[in-house]
Regions:
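A short Gly-Trp-Pro
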Residues: 1-4, 9-136
Length: 136
């Protein structure tokens, strides 16, 4: 799969991943003005246009990146696993995705709602999952 930022300065390539997750945490909502709708791309990601990529450490466990030219969000990356989460909007419109999971569901504001039936995880469930995966 291939995705691009608005100005095409950055191209991201990954293996075909066809599921979308939503994150309702406060950081993601602040970052994008609403929930983050992302494709979990694993660690096998190729990025062209690195010179235009602006990366910052947004928490003790993750980095966020955007295009320094147009501001498009490029990825959220977990530091412990090197797993990339890429906004679904970067990929071609003709790709078929399945909406699978919503995390931080207990942090979702009441002013929006998705109709899809998904797996839902609370903040506590997510932090428990991350804590157990770091102890492997």
């Amino acid at each position: 799969m291939e995705g691009k930022c608005l100005c095409s300065a950055i191209t991201i390539r990954t293996l075909d991943k066809k599921s979308i997750d939503a994150c309702h945490c406060g950081m993601c909502r602040r970052w994008g003005g609403g929930p983050a709708l992302v494709v979990s791309c694993g660690s096998e990601v190729q990025i062209e246009g690195i010179d235009k990529l602006k990366v910052y450490k947004s928490s003790e466990w993750a980095q966020r990146a955007f295009c320094s030219e147009c501001g498009t969000h490029i990825f959220y990356r977990l530091l412990s696993t090197n797993e990339y989460f890429v906004p679904v909007g970067l990929f071609q419109d003709d790709l078929e995705f399945e909406f699978k999971e919503q995390i931080f569901i207990d942090r979702k504001p009441s002013y929006y709602e998705f109709a899809n039936q998904t797996l839902n995880m609370t903040e506590a469930e997510i932090f428990t999952k991350f804590a157990s995966s770091e102890n492997i």
